[in-house]
């Protein structure tokens, strides 16, 4: 099993797909890496030689921010926005969408599950 950037790549998948298991590498980045190293996309991960695995490992770690390094950079960017107090930072702080989507009805993923309104016992009875 190939281990690149702290992630075990699945043996039976194609290399192009296997590389996308690494946080920060998608299909297009995976293809760029494989083109540069002249490795066929359709090669299975378990068919890679040690030299190919080392070449991929070097290309991923040296040229791209992946896994922990990328996660910390993203979280620091969000923290910076929150500290600045700009609109996007405020939206992050309130756990609301920051790209202009409507929140009256949608945005359940960001806002969390619905909280039902509970009536007070004293307010319900009027004489």
UniProtKB/Swiss-Prot annotation:
Record's keyword annotation contains rRNA-binding: yes
Outline the segment boundaries, as ranges, of region: Disordered. Answer: 96-127
Q: Which InterPro entries match?
A: Rbsml_uS13_C, Ribosomal_uS13, Ribosomal_uS13-like_H2TH, Ribosomal_uS13_bac-type, Ribosomal_uS13_CS
Return one GO MF term: rRNA binding
State the Pfam families in the record: Ribosomal_S13 (PF00416)
Name the Gene Ontology biological process terms.
translation
Q: Give UniProt keywords alphabetically.
A: Ribonucleoprotein, Ribosomal protein, RNA-binding, rRNA-binding, tRNA-binding
GO (cellular component) term, any one: cytosol
Q: Where is the composition biased (Basic residues)?
A: 108-127
Q: Which NCBIfam families match?
A: uS13_bact
Role summary = Located at the top of the head of the 30S subunit, it contacts several helices of the 16S rRNA. In the 70S ribosome it contacts the 23S rRNA (bridge B1a) and protein L5 of the 50S subunit (bridge B1b), connecting the 2 subunits; these bridges are implicated in subunit movement. Contacts the tRNAs in the A and P-sites.
Q: How does it assemble?
A: Part of the 30S ribosomal subunit. Forms a loose heterodimer with protein S19. Forms two bridges to the 50S subunit in the 70S ribosome.
Q: What PANTHER family does this protein map onto?
A: 30S RIBOSOMAL PROTEIN S13/40S RIBOSOMAL PROTEIN S18, SMALL RIBOSOMAL SUBUNIT PROTEIN US13M
- Which family, according to UniProt? Belongs to the universal ribosomal protein uS13 family.
Protein name, UniProt field? Small ribosomal subunit protein uS13
- Where does this protein come from, organism-wise? Desulfosudis oleivorans (strain DSM 6200 / JCM 39069 / Hxd3)
Its lineage reads: Bacteria, Pseudomonadati, Thermodesulfobacteriota, Desulfobacteria, Desulfobacterales
Q: Which gene underlies this protein?
A: rpsM
